[in-house]
């Protein structure tokens, strides 16, 4: 299982999902609800559209929207063997492991360290580039 906002898909997202897929037989991705994105600006792309795009990526078996009230609800329902975090995701691994343990979920938490190196491997950088090129028109 992997999670993320996945706003404006870029090569970094693809690398993350490819590496996550290597860790199990099936990759289910939880796409963050707009309401729950707090650590960065709200997504540009609507949540259902982000979910559909993520699900279309060949490494992803299924993409679902997260729960608006309890981020652990889909995890409790799906009971994954592994939860994969990206190199830049804002989760404290120890906190996440402890919260999973409290809920009697025995799943491994793995942080993917592989990072795609490209000029626009960030949704924020893509937005900045668009504004530079077209913002004044």
Curated annotation (Swiss-Prot):
One of its GO terms (molecular function) is FMN adenylyltransferase activity. It comes from the Archaea. Keywords: ATP-binding, FAD, Flavoprotein, FMN, Nucleotide-binding, Nucleotidyltransferase, Transferase. It is an enzyme of class 2 (transferase). CDD domains: cytidylyltransferase (cd02170). The keyword Transport does not apply. InterPro entries: Archaeal_FAD_synthase, Cyt_trans-like, FAD_synth_RibL, Rossmann-like_a/b/a_fold. ATP binds at residues 5-6, 10-13, 88. It catalyses: FMN + ATP + H(+) = FAD + diphosphate. Belongs to the archaeal FAD synthase family. Catalyzes the transfer of the AMP portion of ATP to flavin mononucleotide (FMN) to produce flavin adenine dinucleotide (FAD) coenzyme. Homodimer. PANTHER family: FAD SYNTHASE. This is FAD synthase. It comes from Archaeoglobus fulgidus (strain ATCC 49558 / DSM 4304 / JCM 9628 / NBRC 100126 / VC-16).
């Amino acid at each position: 299982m992997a999670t993320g906002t996945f706003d404006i898909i870029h090569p970094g997202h693809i690398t993350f999902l490819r590496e996550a897929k290597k860790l199990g037989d099936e990759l289910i991705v939880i796409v963050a609800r707009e309401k729950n994105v707090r650590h960065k600006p709200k997504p540009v792309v609507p949540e259902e559209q982000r979910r559909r795009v993520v699900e279309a990526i060949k490494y992803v078996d299924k993409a679902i929207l997260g729960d608006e009230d309890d981020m652990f609800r889909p995890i409790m329902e799906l009971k994954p063997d592994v939860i994969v975090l990206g190199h830049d995701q804002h989760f404290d691994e120890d906190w996440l492991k402890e919260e999973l343990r409290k809920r009697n979920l025995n799943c491994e938490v793995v942080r993917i360290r592989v990072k795609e190196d490209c000029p626009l491997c960030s949704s924020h950088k893509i937005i900045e580039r668009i504004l530079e090129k077209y913002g004044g028109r």
